[in-house]
Amino acid sequence: MKKLISVALAGVMALGLAACGSTPASEPASGSTAASAAYGSSAASASASTESKQYIFSVDDLTGKTIGVQLGTTGDTYAQDIEGATVEQYNKFNDAVLALKQGKVDAVIIDNEPGKVFDEQNDDIIMLDEDFTVEDYAIALNKGSELTEKFNEAIAAIKENGTMDAILDKYINGVEGAEGYVTPEGTEYPNGTLTMATNAYFPPYEYYEGDEIVGIDAEFAKAICDYLGYELKIEDMEFASIIPAINSGKADFGAAGMTVTEERLLNVDFTDSYCTGIQSVLVLK
């Protein structure tokens, strides 16, 4: 599921952002725990709207509230365990934040770094000072993949030679003039191409800059592939489709601020952790 200053993105909320599914923007994803709450029952909608005007001060205040999440993320899992909470699942964080602004949910559980971007781009929402939880990010690969050991070797080297620090300086630490990772001149790719599955609406980990997918995971994956002699191809898809894409062979690995969970380990293997993330909470001011 994804994480110190935010990337300056023009119109983060307008990243409208091409969806792979057919769910309209701001409409809960199919299978939402309470999909009818915002669209079917006027009474439920009125209740959510009323609740969303309350200022939520802490994680404890989420009890009994309507919470927006991105489908398939660890935030989705955490929200299900909040006492008395109604969980609204969305295909993109953008849609969950829009629902918050419209009063359809009371709060959004989101990874810290993307949450900061939404916070800074919207005057009517704020991130709670209290962290919801802390977690580690890793890259997902098919069960038993020979790439896992190779990726771990590359990750260790990239951390040791300062490449990871350079990427974080560019996207998170706000170091002026930081270039991140740049492919060394003369790099060759004798081993073919690897396809990375991601959900490119998760700044600063992955997002669109024009037609190009950029961000921490994109540069980190490029550094790994360069180290191992592979070209990198990035495929954008719904977050919940990443693991199925890996299992089906459509993608060789997945990187999208993914947290290692017992449920995910049933279907994929994970590399060593490359970054620590925080789950945070967005609410209306």
Residue ranges and their predicted role:
Residues 23, 73, 135-177, 219-222, ...:
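Extended ligand-binding regions for polar small-molecule ligands
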Residues 116-153, 181-183, 187, 200, ...:
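Periplasmic-binding protein-like
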Residues 44-58, 139-143, 194-197, 270-285:
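Hydrophobic/proline-rich hinge and linker segments of small-molecule sensing/allosteric domains
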Residues 30-36, 41, 47-49, 59-61, ...:
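Extracytoplasmic small-molecule ligand-binding "clamshell" domains
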Residues 77-81, 101-133, 240-241, 256-267:
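A ligand-binding cleft/hinge motif common to bilobed small-molecule-binding domains
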Residues 15-19:
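C-terminal motif of bacterial Sec signal peptides marking the signal peptidase cleavage site
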Residues 1-11:
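Positively charged n-region of N-terminal signal peptides that target proteins for export
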Residues 56-59, 72-80, 94-97, 101, ...:
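Extracytoplasmic/secreted envelope proteins and their assembly/folding machinery
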